[in-house]
Amino acid sequence: MSDVSTSVQSKFARLAKKKENITYMKREQLTETDKDIAPVLDLKCKDVSAIMNKFKVLMEIQDLMFEEMRETLKNDLKAVLGGKATIPEVKNSENSSSRTEFQQIINLALQKTGMVGKIEGENSKIGDDNENLTFKLEVNELSGKLDNTNEYNSNDGKKLPQGESRSYEVMGSMEETLCNIDDRDGNRNVHLEFTERESRKDGEDEFVKEMREERKFQKLKNKEEVLKASREEKVLMDEGAVLTLVADLSSATLDISKQWSNVFNILRENDFEPKFLCEVKLAFKCDGEIKTFSDLQSLRKFASQKSSVKELLKDVLPQKEEINQGGRKYGIQEKRDKTLIDSKHRAGEITSDGLSFLFLKEVKVAKPEEMKNLETQEEEFSELEELDEEASGMEDDEDTSGLEEEEEEPSGLEEEEEEEASGLEEDEASGLEEEEEQTSEQDSTFQGHTLVDAKHEVEITSDGMETTFIDSVEDSESEEEEEGKSSETGKVKTTSLTEKKASRRQKEIPFSYLVGDSGKKKLVKHQVVHKTQEEEETAVPTSQGTGTPCLTLCLASPSKSLEMSHDEHKKHSHTNLSISTGVTKLKKTEEKKHRTLHTEELTSKEADLTEETEENLRSSVINSIREIKEEIGNLKSSHSGVLEIENSVDDLSSRMDILEERIDSLEDQIEEFSKDTMQMTKQIISKERQRDIEERSRSCNIRLIGIPEKESYENRAEDIIKEIIDENFAELKKGSSLEIVSACRVPSKIDEKRLTPRHILVKFWNSSDKEKIIRASRERREITYQGTRIRLTADLSLDTLDARSKWSNVFKVLLEKGFNPRILYPAKMAFDFRGKTKVFLSIEEFRDYVLHMPTLRELLGNNIP
């Protein structure tokens, strides 16, 4: 216990020293930071003083500026109050005359109206850094626009046409405030309000007269400029230097632009600013917005909404044509009725409000998805046709012969079209004026031609070249459904159904036929004829397998075109009825032929090969089945092992649960032990404190052991100790006197059962006297009293005595071996070994040392505790 107390005391001392060192270091750091901060604070104070000086200078400059501004504003106010106010001119990019008119209105208003000035208050609040100076002048003109020339009535100079008693109000308000200005002398605020509202009934006459004179002067200037321009043009004409810049446009676009000419002139005269756009569109301004129109129909709709525009253009815009729509069979499309084969001379005119007369003809073509289906089905039927050559050879010969005749007809038409194109190129050499006259008076080169619509049986005849547009469409699906019916009724129904489907599914593709580009014209015609030839060649197979329309377009005479259309309907209806029944038979015959050929071609070698392959397949299948069975057996055998593993896992999980419970209990015990250890340490500390107190109280005491007791009790303890000192320590009396406080036997009561005499406890005045006696007793080794040997020791507590008693056996062995052992306070073993003193606090420490030292271990032998 004494060892633990010493270790605790040493730890406390170390901690105290560490705390002192830490506090000392912190104090030094604080002193250093104070030294570093001091110059920084000095610099900051200096910077602040410099900034304040600069700020004062700036404030003085600001005061000077404010004084100058105040003086200028005072001068301006005086000028305004004296009737010298000037109003800035208003800039207007559209009319230069508006500026002068506006200035005159304001001057007249200022002359006839009075001005009132109010100066209100002084000593207003003025801030340090804010300045708000406002100067407003507002002129509200309630008279409306003054730019139109027809604004005033020429017969009456006092009244206006739109408002008989229209008045003009001019309101000028000028406001000036000086606020938030730092002034040392005082605060001033000037607020000026200048308002002027007065009707202009008295001065209308003079004002209107002045406006009329100005407008007359402007008209004269405009006339002079026009005359100058005309004179310059005449001079240039005389000199032969007239230049005209015209866009290089085709004749069709020029003809279209002529339709807008009358409309253009009327709009230009009424200041609508019309323009021709590049896409042959008309644009003009209406209500401040630019309106664009691509055709007369859109313009007519807009005019119907605007009454003013409708009245202007009522003589120019054509009336709508009513279209009589019949039934489904005879209903002709609106665009096809209004198509125009337009050229430089506008041949074959048909009235149209749109721009469709730019195109030769609008042809309807199948969708791209349907064309792909046609191509795939054509490939399938081409294979069937090769097999069907023997059965239907005669029908194919007739069809090909008819197609060759039809191919020869467009070749002749191409020559006629080339001749017409050459004639049109010669006509293009004439000027624009001749073209306008020819379009209005002469007939075109295409007069006498016919536009034939075989689908709806409509013809447009002319005298020259005959053009026919034939749309032949067949639908095989509708024909296959009606195979059982009569041929005549079947033909009529199929043609009607195909015409209906074609009108729904086809797309419109316009072919431009501009007369100015003769090369393009030839190419377009050649492409059209070439397409007709290709489509006629593929007419029979496509009609057999698909229900999509396949169109043909050819140029021929009226009689030939009608015959061709009639023959084509017959051919297609005949082929549709014959091939549908023949295809199924051919398929069956082909399947039989292929089977027979396949069986005949198989030879013996091929049969052997097939047998070998079959055997190999069988063997491989059997092997795979065996392997699968083996794997299944292995799985079954391993199933028991899996079950055992599952059981073992269950056991392990149960054991784990038990272990967790035990660990929890052990943790609880450890917590309890930790609590017990805390209590034990507290008890040990308290005991150590008690022992220390007891040891200090016994520090001046000596025990005398072995002095016999007399029955008479004549000899007292004090006399006995004096005799012992005189007998054994006579030299100590010479140097100093040993003062004894008390001496008595312990315990105070006599125990008759006790065999040994009681100890005598002697207490000295000083602990130094006690130490002298103990040191002398160690040197003498033997102390006697009246010839008997006695023992003299220090007075110690029971705890220290118990701790020292543990060293008794070790002490004896070391004493016998000559190591000079001794027990130090409170219970330390010390002995000499190899010229050094070894000190041990506990027996465990001594045992560890002996085990590592073989010499000591040999000497001590079995006496090691």
Curated annotation (Swiss-Prot):
Region (Disordered): 370-508, 590-612
Keywords noted in UniProt: Acetylation, Coiled coil, Phosphoprotein
One Gene Ontology term from the biological process aspect of the record: retrotransposition
GO-annotated cellular components: intracellular membrane-bounded organelle; ribonucleoprotein complex
Molecular-function GO terms, alphabetical: single-stranded RNA binding
N-acetylserine carried by residues: S2
Biased composition (Acidic residues): 376-440, 472-483
Entry coiled-coil feature ranges: 642-684
Gene3D superfamilies according to UniProt: L1 transposable element, C-terminal domain (3.30.250.20), L1 transposable element, RRM domain (3.30.70.1820)
Phosphoserine PTM positions: S2, S154, S472, S476, S478, S518, S561, S573, S640, S648, S665
Extent of Basic and acidic residues compositional bias: 498-508, 590-608
Pfam families reported for this sequence: Tnp_22_dsRBD, Transposase_22
Entry-annotated residues carrying Phosphothreonine: T149
Entry-linked InterPro entries: L1_C, L1_dsRBD, L1_RRM_dom, Transposase_22
Family: Belongs to the transposase 22 family.
PANTHER family to which the protein is assigned, alphabetical: L1 TRANSPOSABLE ELEMENT-RELATED
Name of protein: LINE-1 type transposase domain-containing protein 1
